[in-house]
């Protein structure tokens, strides 16, 4: 399956994860197995942003569009960070863990989407999960990905508009 992931890009053109293991270099064209992030004493995962919910695996989207991630203006995300890019990724999708993950979100008769996840990497597969109520479209968490290529801003706009009916986030310049 093809999905999209946003990365930081350094001055040498190397890709890096946005938050967890943010200093690691991500190669293009090689299958990568997710690692569990370092846990805090409260059970969260350490990240560049500070502690985050523990949902181990590669986080990707069906669309190269993340209106919940970026540069804020007047309290709302308006732009992509200038040092980020979208990449087309192949997701290893032999096993779909979505039903198992969603079962974790059921408490009695109520469904809590923030709990509809796994506390382990989805070995040999993936599951659909929306990490943020402000996120767009369907997101997934996977064990393995291969970065096929970095997309140009023009390619991101083309995919967003023709496949999802939204314009790509503008990039913050300057």
Which residue ranges define each predicted feature?
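Extended catalytic/binding region for NAD+/ADP-ribose chemistry, centered on the ART fold
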Residues: 47-72
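Active-site and NAD+-binding cores of ADP-ribose-processing enzymes
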Residues: 1-45, 74-174
């Amino acid at each position: 399956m093809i999905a999209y992931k946003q990365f930081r890009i350094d001055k040498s053109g190397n890709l890096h994860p946005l938050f967890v293991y943010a200093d690691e270099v991500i190669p293009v064209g090689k299958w990568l197995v997710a690692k569990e992030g370092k846990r805090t004493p409260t059970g969260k995962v350490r990240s560049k942003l500070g502690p985050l919910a523990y949902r181990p695996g590669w986080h990707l989207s069906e669309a190269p569009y993340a209106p919940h991630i970026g540069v804020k203006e007047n309290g709302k995300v308006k732009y992509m960070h200038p040092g980020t890019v979208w990449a087309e990724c192949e997701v290893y999708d032999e096993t779909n863990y979505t039903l198992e993950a969603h079962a974790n979100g059921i408490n009695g008769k109520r469904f809590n989407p923030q709990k509809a996840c796994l506390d382990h990497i989805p070995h040999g597969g993936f599951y659909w999960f929306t990490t943020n109520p402000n996120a767009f479209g369907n997101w997934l968490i996977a064990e393995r990905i291969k970065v096929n290529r970095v997309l140009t801003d023009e390619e991101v706009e083309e995919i967003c508009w023709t496949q999802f009916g939204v314009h790509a986030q503008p990039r913050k310049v300057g």
